[in-house]
Amino acid sequence: MTPERVPSVVFKTRVRDESVPGPNPYRWEDKTTEQIFGGKKVVLFSLPGAFTPTCSSNHLPRYEQLFEEFQALGVDDIICLSVNDAFVMFQWGKQIGADKVKLLPDGNGEFTRKMGMLVEKSNLGFGMRSWRYSMFVNDGKIEKMFIEPEFGDNCPVDPFECSDADTMLAYLKGAEAPGVSEPVKAFVG
């Protein structure tokens, strides 16, 4: 069952801070669900893992590519969430060139678990990960969710049919979804 509101959790993030000495000027910063979603219109999409093929070739790059179109429809932030730590998410964002979509690490999987989207992916050596989904959130209230089919532990496939950027954009425009776009970037890995 989909919750009505985003769950209340604290995310462990890393932020740049020039007052931190040395070659790695970052510090830990806790961010609450209220800080992230409160008073904002947010599109959040969640995926199984940074650096994975579909996530790197289409899911994140297409949201990045369509960012201005989402903004024109009143979306304040687009957030990519994964059950990965802050260091992995940061390096993946650099490698992809993501500078518009915010990458949010759910390192302990708490948000994902409370959303009911945590699945076992030990068949791929991933452990506990997020199922692929997207949602439109208005001031913490979940207005629409697109959850990929075949939800379950150790699913032998990785569906990518409805959590894509084009489907969410079509929903916000009140239009028919055109289907998943072709990959935006080539996956190297």
Swiss-Prot record:
Name the source's superkingdom. Bacteria
Which GO MF terms does the UniProt record name?
A: identical protein binding; thioredoxin peroxidase activity
Which SUPFAM superfamilies does the UniProt record give?
A: Thioredoxin-like
What is any Pfam family matched here? Redoxin
The record's active-site residues are C55
Q: Which residues form the Thioredoxin domain?
A: 2-177
Task: Print the keywords alphabetically.
Answer: Antioxidant, Oxidoreductase, Peroxidase, Redox-active center
E.C. code:
1.11.1.27
Q: Does the keyword DNA repair apply?
A: no
Q: Which reaction does it catalyse?
A: a hydroperoxide + 2 glutathione = an alcohol + glutathione disulfide + H2O
Q: Name one GO cellular component term.
A: cytoplasm
Q: Name one GO biological process term.
A: hydrogen peroxide catabolic process
Q: Which CDD domains match?
A: PRX5_like
EC primary class: oxidoreductase
Task: Quote the Gene3D superfamilies the UniProt record gives.
Answer: Glutaredoxin
On assembly, the entry states: Monomer.
Family, per entry: Belongs to the peroxiredoxin family. Prx5 subfamily.
Protein name, UniProt field: Peroxiredoxin sll1621
